[in-house]
Amino acid sequence: MTLTMSTVVFFSLILLTLGLQPKDKDEGVMGRSRLGKRGLLMRSLDEELKSNDCPEYCPHGNECCEHHECRYDPWSRELKCLDSR
């Protein structure tokens, strides 16, 4: 089977797209994917919400809900709104 360059590019894009899909944890709304600096996959964190409509992440100094504070999570390496109680 002979593959043309456009076919190779097409399948490469499909594989790349499938590899960049965010994993659905327990959040209600998944954010969009985008390729960030250093080629790392990042979610549109300002749009991703927990099931109680509070943001899970707090990039760019966004406010967290009541009884939550913005802290660095070493496991995910992201700023998250974590329960302060």
From Swiss-Prot:
UniProt GO molecular function: toxin activity
Organs and tissues of expression: Expressed by the venom duct.
Primary location recorded for the protein, binned into one broad class: secreted
Disulfide bridge positions per record: C54-C65, C58-C70, C64-C81
Source organism superkingdom: Eukaryota
Stretch forming the signal peptide: 1-20
Location relative to the cell: Secreted
A single GO cellular-component term on record: extracellular region
Propeptide: 21-43
Keywords, comma-separated and alphabetical: Cleavage on pair of basic residues, Disulfide bond, Knottin, Secreted, Signal, Toxin
Domain notes: The presence of a 'disulfide through disulfide knot' structurally defines this protein as a knottin. The cysteine framework is VI/VII (C-C-CC-C-C).
Name of the protein described by the UniProt record: Augerpeptide-s6a
